[in-house]
Amino acid sequence: WSHMIPNNFFKQCGINPTAKIVNILKSKNISKPIIGFPFKAGSSLISYSYESNVDCLALDWTVDLNWAKKNINSLITIQGNLDPASLIPNKSVFLEKNVLSILDIMKDNKFIFNVGHGLTPDCKINNVKKVIDIVKNYK
């Protein structure tokens, strides 16, 4: 819950511990990509993307992807950031539009489509299937 760390302590309490863990894993020749998810870190995402040594930065649904494209380290992959609430039945009216918007914005970047903070118990499984179909058929 990165947003709970005051900005002046984010490097010390958020970035440095992550970088230490990532560096240890990489020194052990771990070949799998390492994903960091500094939930609601706001503008601290910029320094996190450059200093944490993660291979992929997962973004929650509050991050504007156009901002991310301009500010996040372009050498790492971005993952995210569909609002999980859009999978809830009464909030799914704009689901396809939201998914396509994310895909359109990120189409020329290293990107993994994902929900911006996991599925909630009240999400509709048909909406999850719909998202999968949209992503699979996106051109």
Predicted regions and their residues:
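Active-site loop segments of alpha/beta catalytic cores
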Residues: 1-139
